[in-house]
């Protein structure tokens, strides 16, 4: 298994952050790692979406867990490995909200692909979380 986590605190209210997360079609507005996105349903477990990174191939993903106002998990199943990212809101220091992105790569090929693919997937997490926080704090 390969794993990585990044978090940041913000003064933005959890419901404001959640509003931006739960509007998948708007993700490219604040996430520079997404050139285009197509959603096949509501923001709920089981909904699939196709995310296209800049200069990249479209990736088919699925929401596997949604706890309104708290967390959602998306997953890309590549057969011999699965990339799973949990996006979570937690109480922070002095009334702040902590935004957490955690990615795990699991499955039979995880030890082979994780060390190369994982850092490529998660390299922009600090920038993505910072952009979300800036948007939510407006």
Regions from the PLM with identified roles:
Residues 1-38:
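Hydrophobic ligand-binding cavity/cleft-lining segments
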Residues 7-9, 75, 88, 100-104:
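Residue-level recognition of well-ordered beta-strand positions that form the cores
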Residues 38-84, 98, 131-138:
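Glycine-rich portal/gate segments that line the openings of hydrophobic small-molecule binding cavities
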Residues 61-62, 83-86, 109-115:
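A short, polar/proline- and glycine-enriched secondary-structure boundary/capping micro-motif
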Residues 65, 87-93:
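Short, low-complexity Ser/Thr-rich regulatory SLiMs
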Residues 77-81, 102-109:
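Short, solvent-exposed aromatic-acidic interface loops
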Residues 104-138:
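A conserved amphipathic terminal alpha-helix motif
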């Amino acid at each position: 298994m390969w794993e990585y986590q990044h978090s940041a605190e913000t003064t933005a209210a959890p419901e404001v952050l959640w509003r931006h997360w739960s509007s998948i079609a708007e993700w490219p507005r604040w996430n520079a790692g997404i050139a285009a996105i197509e959603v096949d349903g509501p923001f709920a477990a089981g909904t699939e979406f196709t995310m296209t990174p800049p200069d990249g191939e479209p990736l088919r993903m699925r929401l596997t867990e949604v706890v309104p106002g708290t967390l959602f998990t998306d997953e890309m199943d590549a057969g011999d490995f699965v990339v799973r990212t949990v996006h979570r809101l937690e109480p922070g220091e002095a009334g702040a909200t902590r935004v957490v992105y955690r990615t795990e790569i699991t499955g039979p090929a995880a030890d082979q692909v994780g060390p190369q693919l994982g850092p490529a997937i998660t390299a922009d997490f600090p920038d993505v979380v910072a952009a979300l926080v800036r948007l939510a704090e407006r």
